[in-house]
Structures are given as structure tokens and as C-alpha cells.
UniProtKB/Swiss-Prot annotation:
Keywords carried by this UniProt record: Ribonucleoprotein, Ribosomal protein
Natural source organism: Pediococcus pentosaceus (strain ATCC 25745 / CCUG 21536 / LMG 10740 / 183-1w)
Listed NCBIfam families: rpmD_bact (TIGR01308)
GO annotations of cellular component type: cytosolic large ribosomal subunit
Gene behind the chain: rpmD
Record has Ribonucleoprotein as a keyword: yes
UniProt GO molecular function: structural constituent of ribosome
Protein name per the record: Large ribosomal subunit protein uL30
């Protein structure tokens, strides 16, 4: 299964509480922090909600 590298591009400050929670649950802290996550439905659902704050690239 492939994996996704998720990088926080914009700050989660002054965003909806749900969006801030998703950023923390994905393991992203500060701007420009990155994390590698499995490419599954749960991850893609979370990414959908904060797509305007992050950058996603596929890692093999």
C-alpha cells in the first residue's frame, strides 16, 4: 500500500476547532512540519477537511 507525505503549509491558528483537531491528530505541529501516513480512507477523509492548509504527495 502506498503512503502519503503530508506537509502543513498554512497555520491552523484562527481556523475552525474541527480543523485544528484534525491537524493535531495527523501529527502536524508547526508550519512546514511533515508526516508520512498510510493511504487509506480515514487518512484521505481527514485530508479532505484540511486540504487548504496542507500539501500532499505520494511516497512509495
Amino acid at each position: 500500500m502506498s503512503q502519503l507525505k503530508v506537509t502543513l503549509i498554512k497555520s491552523a491558528a484562527h481556523r475552525l476547532p474541527k480543523q485544528r483537531t484534525i491537524v493535531k491528530e495527523l501529527g502536524l505541529g508547526r508550519v512546514n512540519s511533515s508526516v508520512v501516513l498510510p493511504n487509506n480512507e480515514a487518512t484521505r477523509g481527514a485530508i479532505f477537511h484540511i486540504a487548504h492548509l496542507i500539501e500532499v504527495e505520494e511516497v512509495k
